[in-house]
Structures are given as structure tokens and as C-alpha cells.
């Protein structure tokens, strides 16, 4: 039921965004940046204490996509995802050349023997993987929009894929909604002494969100928010 409500909320966001986009005179194309060997320094805005850079597109399962060329897209996990996942033991990435579908698994996080999948925001063939991240999963927590990227994808229909993702104000709404749901859930956890001090808009969320989640709740909670 929760997943259905989340998806209905996402569809509502897209409908509103489509309505307003029809009134715009100028349509801004997806931002292109330098190749992967010159990682951009993305200046993020803050929503509910979570970093939400404005020049990337977001899947509601908390992964992001950034256009590097008309068909090459870099993919990663957003700040909400890495804080909720916490310190993981490993991140399993797909193979180069593997075909991914938008909305299906892009990688697997493992913590204390429990696995949870992340969803791909884009469809296409895996061009490259972040081997440094596979060796050191902490990179994702330290720099989710930079050195902690997951993969790059050659997407023949990237333009259409990007239309299915959240950007700008819609991405901010979605992150705020996710942060609100997360706050409401903490009091329901058995044995929880107090909810984490998630900051309001403009603040910085605590980094140890995952550490305050009971082990027996972590898998279900991450799968709910990651839509996996």
C-alpha cells in the first residue's frame, strides 16, 4: 500500500510539472558537463537537510542521472539514499556492457548480511563502472554527487528517459516528502529512544541516520524508500 501511495504521489508531481512546463516559453536542455575524468563540483541546495543539486535529474527511488553527452549519462545515489543506507559493507555494480532498464536494479548494497537494491534512473548499456567505489563504498557517503558515482551508461533514448525523472522544484518536493515520511516513521520503531534530529530546510541532516534504525527495520525501510 505504501509503495502505491508513493507512486501515486510521483505521478501527481509529474502531472503538475507537465502542466506548468506547457506554459514555459523556453525549455532548458539537460545540462552537459565535462567527461568523467573531470568530475564537476556540483553546488547543492538543501532540502530537509539533504543535498539536492539542481543540475541532475532524480528517480523517485533516490538515484540520480547527469547528462555528459547526448547519449552518455552518469548515475549515482542521492544524498538521502546514502544517509539512509549508512555504512555498507559492499556495493555490487553491474558489468560493463550489461543492459539496464529504467526502474530496475542498478546495484546492490550489503550491510551485515542484508542486501538491498537501488533502482536505475536510466536505460542503456553500462559504459563504465566506478571501481574505486567498489573497493571503497565509503566514497558514496562522502561524495555522492562526485567521487561516489556508480556507473556511466550509453543510453540511446536518454532524452525520453530524462522526461520520466524529477528535476528542479519537483525534485525538491520529492526529497521533502521523503524526509517527512522518514521523520514520521522513527517513533514507531520498537526500542527507539528518540528520532534523529533531521534538520529543517537549510540545515544539514545528521550523518548517522542509519545507525539509529534497528537492524531488523533497516531492510524494509530502505526497500520502501528505494522502491525496490
Language-model segments: residues:
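Contiguous, well-folded functional domains in the mature portion of proteins
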Residues: 1-228
Amino acid at each position: 500500500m505504501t509503495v502505491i501511495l508513493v507512486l501515486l504521489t510521483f505521478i501527481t508531481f509529474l502531472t503538475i510539472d507537465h502542466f506548468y512546463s506547457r506554459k514555459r516559453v523556453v525549455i532548458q536542455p539537460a545540462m552537459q558537463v565535462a567527461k568523467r575524468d573531470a568530475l564537476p563540483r556540483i553546488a547543492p541546495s538543501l532540502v530537509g537537510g539533504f543535498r539536492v543539486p539542481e543540475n541532475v535529474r532524480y528517480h523517485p527511488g533516490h538515484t540520480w542521472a547527469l547528462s555528459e553527452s547526448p547519449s552518455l549519462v552518469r548515475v549515482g545515489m542521492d544524498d538521502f539514499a546514502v544517509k539512509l543506507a549508512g555504512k555498507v559493507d559492499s556495493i555490487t555494480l553491474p558489468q560493463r556492457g550489461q543492459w539496464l532498464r529504467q526502474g530496475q536494479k542498478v546495484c546492490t548494497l550489503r550491510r551485515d548480511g542484508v542486501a538491498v537494491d537501488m533502482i536505475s534512473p536510466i536505460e542503456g548499456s553500462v559504459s563504465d563502472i566506478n571501481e574505486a567505489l567498489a573497493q571503497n563504498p565509503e566514497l558514496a557517503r562522502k561524495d555522492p554527487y562526485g567521487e561516489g558515482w556508480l556507473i556511466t551508461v550509453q543510453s540511446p533514448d536518454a532524452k525520453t528517459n530524462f522526461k520520466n525523472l524529477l528535476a528542479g522544484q519537483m525534485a525538491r518536493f520529492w526529497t521533502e516528502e521523503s524526509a517527512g515520511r522518514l521523520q514520521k516513521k522513527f517513533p514507531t520503531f520498537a526500542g527507539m529512544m528518540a528520532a534523529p534530529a533531521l534538520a529543517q530546510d537549510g540545515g544539514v541532516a545528521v550523518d548517522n541516520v542509519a545507525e539509529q534504525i534497528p537492524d531488523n527495520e533497516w531492510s524494509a525501510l530502505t526497500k520502501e524508500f528505494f522502491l525496490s
